């Protein structure tokens, strides 16, 4: 377990993580060393980038709407594709900010399915219903693809259509 890094700036407390390690590795948990580091947090919009960013994966345990709020200028200027996990508690706030410039696609990794979401799908998601027999409620990933991205490009990429 060398160089294992656990990020504590999330929804889990340090004690929660330590107890998980104790339970899962009772004979080895004393070998773990714990460090405390402080990091400066910056809004995405305040960071200078040397290269154009075209894809972003956001995984912040339900705080996606805050990340997206802090990157409004970046999204407007760069229009990257990005991926988030569906979270019912903040999805409407996210969609409200993005629907003007983005399409939303549902992707289920274990089935390799990719499906554009329409209003009826959003309603089903928000009501906790399975969209259809090919999609589970457990692992719903959402791709946001800029409306101005050429479909020709997407077709040629081999990933989406």
Regions found by a protein language model. Give the residues of each.
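Phosphate/nucleotide-binding beta-alpha loop and adjacent structural elements of enzyme active sites
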Residues: 1-161
